[in-house]
Every structure is written in C-alpha cells, then in structure tokens.
C-alpha cells in the first residue's frame, strides 16, 4: 500500500508544482516587493527615467511641429505687400527684375495703387475743398490715404532687404520716394482739411523726492563754535 501511495503523492506534487509555475509565468512581476539594488536594479530605474524623458521630449517636439507659429499681423501684411509688388514687376512692360527696380518704378507703383484707394481727396474746384466733414457727396476722386502709403513703403523697404536686396540700393529708401510721400501728405492735408502733424508728447516732470509736499527742507544749522575750555 505504501508503495502505491508514493507514486500518487509524487504525481500530485508534480501537478501542483506545474500549476504554480504556470501562474508565475502568467502573473506580471511585482517590482514593489523586490526593491532595486545599487547595481542592476538601479540601472533599470535609470533606463526607465531616460525613456520617459526622451518620450516626453519627442512628444513635445512633435507638438511643436504640429502647431507652427502664426506670423504676426505686421509680418503677414508685409508678405502680402511684397507679393503684390512682385506681381506688379512681372506684369510691367517690359517685365522687371528686383535688381532692375529703381525709385521711379516705386513711384509708378504708388500711383498705380491710387485707383484702389478709398479716401476722398477734394480738388481745388470742389466747394468742399479743405472741409474735414463735407455735408454732401461730391465727384472728387478716391485716392490712397497718405498714412497707408507711408506704412506700405516702410514694409516694402524692410521686405526688400529681407529678400536679398542691399540697403544701399533699396529703391524704397531713395529721396524721390520720400519727397513724393511728403507732397501727398501736404496735398491731402489741404484738400481734406486735416492735419497730419504728430502731437508732441508732454515730457514727464521729475518726481519730487524731498517728501516735503513740494517744499525743500531748510539746510541744517552750522555746528556751534568750540568752547574755551576745550581749546585749552
């Protein structure tokens, strides 16, 4: 009997051990119960930290690439103005390159833009000449406002150099263009009855640091003369 029980007990023990081994394979390792040592375990922790940091860096880099920086309103307007000027040069007869552009071509471009203006500029024969608020409509032409032209030239002057142009050959910075803008400003100021003079800002007065309500403190009295005993 005892010899028959031993194989049965051995078989049961083998079955139990096999089930335990299978459970150990299916169950995830519990890292909390076995803290990392200074050798291999510490290295594993470092790899995990490096992996998380690299993953965070890649995700942040991916997020930055997915959301490109939107150009400012000034930069977007400058790009549109430069494209418009480039189209004007291509449609010119004969077509002009950027290196061939001069101040005369800039003046032609500014006069060309007048047909798209929205500012009423009264002629000398108009009864509303010099009237800032005309009470009735008139057949005077629409022109580009001086402020719009001045800002346009400033943007194109910067765009010319940003696109490879040399500052000494910038056609938007020549004297003829500056004189034209001055004439437009003076003529529109007279015709529209407005003033384009910049208001002078008042200089801030220095703050009173005396602390006496605006009245300076009197100087301290002189020290008393030394006594006769002290002199001896």
Curated annotation (Swiss-Prot):
Any one GO CC term of the record: nucleus
Alphabetical UniProt keywords: Developmental protein, DNA-binding, Nucleus, Transcription, Transcription regulation
Domain of life of the organism encoding this protein: Eukaryota
One example of a Gene Ontology biological process annotation: post-embryonic plant morphogenesis
Localisation: Nucleus
Compositional bias segments (type: Gly residues): 38-53
UniProt short sequence motif Nuclear localization signal, positions renumbered to this chain: 198-202
Pro residues biased stretches: 216-232
UniProt-recorded Gene Ontology molecular function terms: DNA binding
Stretches for region Disordered: 20-77, 189-232
Family membership: Belongs to the plant homeotic and developmental regulators ALOG protein family.
Function noted in UniProt: Probable transcription regulator that acts as a developmental regulator by promoting cell growth in response to light.
Protein known as: Protein G1-like3
Species in which this protein is naturally found: Oryza sativa subsp. indica
Organism classification: Eukaryota, Viridiplantae, Streptophyta, Embryophyta, Tracheophyta
């Amino acid at each position: 009997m005892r010899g028959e029980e031993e194989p049965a007990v051995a078989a049961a023990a083998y079955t139990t051990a096999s089930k335990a081994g299978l459970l150990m394979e299916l169950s995830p390792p519990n890292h909390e119960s076995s803290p990392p040592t200074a050798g291999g375990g510490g290295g594993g922790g470092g790899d995990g930290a490096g992996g998380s940091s690299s993953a965070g860096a890649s995700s942040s880099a991916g997020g930055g690439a997915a959301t490109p920086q939107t150009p400012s309103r000034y930069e977007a307007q400058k790009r549109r103005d430069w494209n418009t000027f480039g189209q004007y040069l291509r449609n010119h007869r004969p077509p002009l390159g950027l290196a061939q552009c001069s101040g005369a071509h800039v003046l032609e471009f500014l006069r060309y833009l007048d047909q798209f203006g929205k500012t009423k500029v009264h002629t000398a024969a108009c009864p509303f000449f010099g009237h800032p608020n005309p009470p009735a409509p008139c057949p005077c032409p629409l022109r580009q406002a001086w402020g719009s032209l001045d800002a346009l030239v400033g943007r194109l002057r910067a765009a010319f150099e940003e696109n490879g142009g040399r500052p000494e050959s910038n056609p938007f910075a020549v004297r003829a263009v500056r004189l034209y803008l001055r004439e437009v400003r003076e003529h529109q100021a007279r015709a529209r009855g407005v003033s384009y003079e910049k208001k002078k800002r008042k200089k801030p007065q220095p703050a009173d640091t005396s602390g006496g309500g605006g009245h300076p403190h009197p100087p301290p009295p002189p020290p008393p003369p030394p006594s006769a005993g002290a002199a001896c």
